[in-house]
């Protein structure tokens, strides 16, 4: 295990110290057959379990939206940093890729609204192992950190749900993908519960 400067949104950078296995490169498992990128990249997903990470990892939620011709993933939330927990905004723009068996690729920016100096840009790759689009998804994600953080790689496997009160039978997923989900960190492990995101203030016209 290696202590590194990072916690991940989907795999996405956050400024924190956490233990993740050291890997030399991204090693994507096989993607699900006939994966529909458009159906997956719409609406909201909640992380409910993660192979690695902290409370922040399993408390993450993501929104997908279309801005012009661009598909954007939004991962605003609280991230651990220097012993504290702080709010960051995260935006990932998908790169063109029509090959369904290839990883989804994104360019990402994560920054602190209160401290402009805390900002990083990085590349994210995502492979969907299984999903029914309406209820759950199992995702492998991998990030290469920027030069200022060592240019090393970090990966994770996440269980996502559309609704927190409608969880799927994990036994079926385990048998299908040969995963050990009970060994994953769970949102249920967060004793104090996940923090609510701050409400966004609408700009008023003068």
UniProtKB/Swiss-Prot annotation:
Activity regulation (record text): Zn(2+) modulates binding to host coagulation factor XII (F12) and high molecular weight kininogen (KNG1).
List, alphabetically, the Gene3D superfamilies matched: 2.40.128.20
Matching Pfam families: Triabin (PF03973)
Q: Which domain of life is it from?
A: Eukaryota
The primary site where this protein sits is: secreted
**Single Gene Ontology BP annotation:** suppression of blood coagulation in another organism
State the UniProt keywords alphabetically: Blood coagulation cascade inhibiting toxin, Glycoprotein, Hemostasis impairing toxin, Secreted, Signal, Toxin
Q: Listed GO molecular functions? A: toxin activity
UniProt-annotated location(s): Secreted
Where in the sequence does glycosylation occur per the annotation?
55
Q: Which InterPro entries match?
A: Calycin (IPR012674), Triabi/Procalin (IPR005657)
| Quaternary context | Interacts with host coagulation factor XII (F12) (inactive and activated) (via amino acids 1-77). Interacts with host high molecular weight kininogen (KNG1) (via amino acids 402-532).
Annotated family: Belongs to the calycin superfamily. Triabin family.
Report what the protein is called: Triafestin-1
Question: Where does this protein come from, organism-wise?
Answer: Triatoma infestans (Assassin bug)
């Amino acid at each position: 295990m290696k202590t590194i400067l990072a916690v991940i949104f989907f795999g996405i950078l956050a400024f924190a110290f956490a233990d993740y296995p050291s890997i030399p490169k991204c090693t994507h498992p096989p993607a699900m057959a006939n994966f529909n990128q458009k159906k997956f990249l719409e609406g909201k997903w909640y992380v409910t379990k993660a192979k690695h990470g902290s409370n922040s990892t399993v408390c993450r939620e993501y929104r997908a939206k279309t801005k012009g011709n661009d598909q954007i993933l939004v991962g605003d939330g609280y991230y651990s940093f220097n012993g504290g927990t702080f709010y960051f905004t995260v935006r990932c723009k998908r790169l063109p890729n029509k090959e369904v068996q290839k990883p989804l690729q994104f360019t990402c920016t994560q920054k602190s609204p209160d401290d402009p100096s805390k900002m990083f840009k990085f590349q994210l790759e995502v492979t969907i192992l299984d999903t029914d689009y309406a209820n759950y998804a199992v995702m492998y994600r991998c990030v290469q950190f920027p030069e200022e953080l060592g240019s090393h790689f970090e990966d994770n496997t996440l269980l996502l749900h559309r609704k927190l009160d409608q969880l799927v039978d994990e036994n079926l997923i385990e048998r299908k993908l040969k995963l050990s989900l009970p060994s994953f960190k769970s949102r249920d492990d967060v004793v104090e519960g996940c923090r609510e995101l701050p409400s966004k203030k609408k700009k008023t016209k003068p």
